[in-house]
Amino acid sequence: MNIEIIVPGKLSSHLQNVFDFYLKKLKRFANLSVTFTKLGGDVNRESKQVILRREKDEILNKVKNRRFILIDLHGKQMDSISFSKFVENEMLSGELLFVIGGPLGIDDELRKKASLKISLSKMTFTHEFTLVILLEQLFRAFKIINNEKYHY
């Protein structure tokens, strides 16, 4: 299975070890790639809408015409079992594409183009933490799918 995650910005050095840990663990289950796009600009110099529009354009340029799942605070909430069933069903298509919004959120047009919106929590996380949480939940999903213990 191919899994791609598109996220604006860069990963902070303090999260790099956790990111690398889950990338390594997930290699056993899927071909995973993470694409970091440019941030849309400086909020001190430009409006939020201009920045979100730029980020949306960058993301859609990477998405092309593919179906994608948006990680969105207002999306569908699932527990880990439901998410693992979702991933298992998507394995039939051979590809999963996730998009995470940037620090200022998500442009409405990007939200409308998503084939599905999933929320990881009712809480708000930074885009970097969202990436790490998504990686952890993907790893957990594959462990559930393969009927393997998660802890130790």
Curated annotation (Swiss-Prot):
Specifically methylates the pseudouridine at position 1915 (m3Psi1915) in 23S rRNA. It is found in: Cytoplasm. InterPro entries: Alpha/beta_knot_MTases, RlmH-like, tRNA_m1G_MTases_N. S-adenosyl-L-methionine binds at I71, G101, L120, S121, K122, M123, T124, F125. The lineage of its organism: Bacteria, Thermotogati, Thermotogota, Thermotogae, Thermotogales. Belongs to the RNA methyltransferase RlmH family. Coiled coil: none annotated. Homodimer. It comes from Thermosipho africanus (strain TCF52B). Its EC number is 2.1.1.177. This is Ribosomal RNA large subunit methyltransferase H. Keywords: Cytoplasm, Methyltransferase, rRNA processing, S-adenosyl-L-methionine, Transferase. The keyword Protease does not apply. It is an enzyme of class 2 (transferase). GO terms for cellular component: cytoplasm. Pfam families: SPOUT_MTase. CDD domains: RlmH-like (cd18081). The keyword S-adenosyl-L-methionine applies. It comes from the Bacteria. It catalyses: pseudouridine(1915) in 23S rRNA + S-adenosyl-L-methionine = N(3)-methylpseudouridine(1915) in 23S rRNA + S-adenosyl-L-homocysteine + H(+). Its main location: cytoplasm. GO terms for molecular function: rRNA (pseudouridine-N3-)-methyltransferase activity.
